[in-house]
Amino acid sequence: DEDETYVITGSVIGSYTSGTEDYLIKLQNQPYRYMQRPDKIYMPLDSSLTSIGGYFSRVMLNKQKGNFYVNAALGIISPGFEYNDLGSQWMADKINGHLVTGYRWYEPDDVFRNKSVYLGYSRTSDFEDNISRSGFYLNSNVQFLNYWGINFNTSYNFKSVSTTLTRGGPKLNIPSNI
C-alpha cells in the first residue's frame, strides 16, 4: 500500500552448473545436499551427471506499521540450486514457511517504556517432505522506564527428522522437544 504499512517482497533466482562427472559428484555430496544418503529418493546421487540446475524462490508479507504485527514467508530452494561461486552456500533442498503474529505497545505506561508479544509457527522440510522443523514459538519482552528489559522465549517443536546429522548416512528421528 502507499503508506507502506503492508509490504510484500519476493525473489526468484536460478542456477546452472556444468563440469566433469567428478566435479558434479562432489557437488552432490556437499553437506547442504547429501545426495549420497542411502535412503534418498528424490534426486539421489547420479554419478553420470555433467550439469545440475536449480532455483531459489521466496515471498514475504510484512505488516510494518502499527501495534498489530504480521510476518509470513514461504521459501523454496531446490536440491540442484548451486550458488557457492558467490560465497558460502549452506542450504539446498528446503521448503520453509512461517507465520508470526503479535502485538507491540509503543506508548509508555507507569512501568514499561514498551512491550511486545509474538506467537509464531514455522515448518521446514525437504523435497521428500522429511520435516526437519515444525513448531510453535512464543516471544515476549518488556523494557522498563529505566531502559532495562526482560525477554521471554519458549518453543515447542514437533517430532522431526534430520537428514544431515549422519553426514550422508540415513536420516534420524528427532523427538519432540521444548
Predicted regions located by residue number:
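Exposed, low-structure sequence patches enriched in small/polar residues
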Residues: T5-I178
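Hydrophobic, small-residue-rich alpha-helical packing segments that form membrane-like cores
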Residues: D1-D3
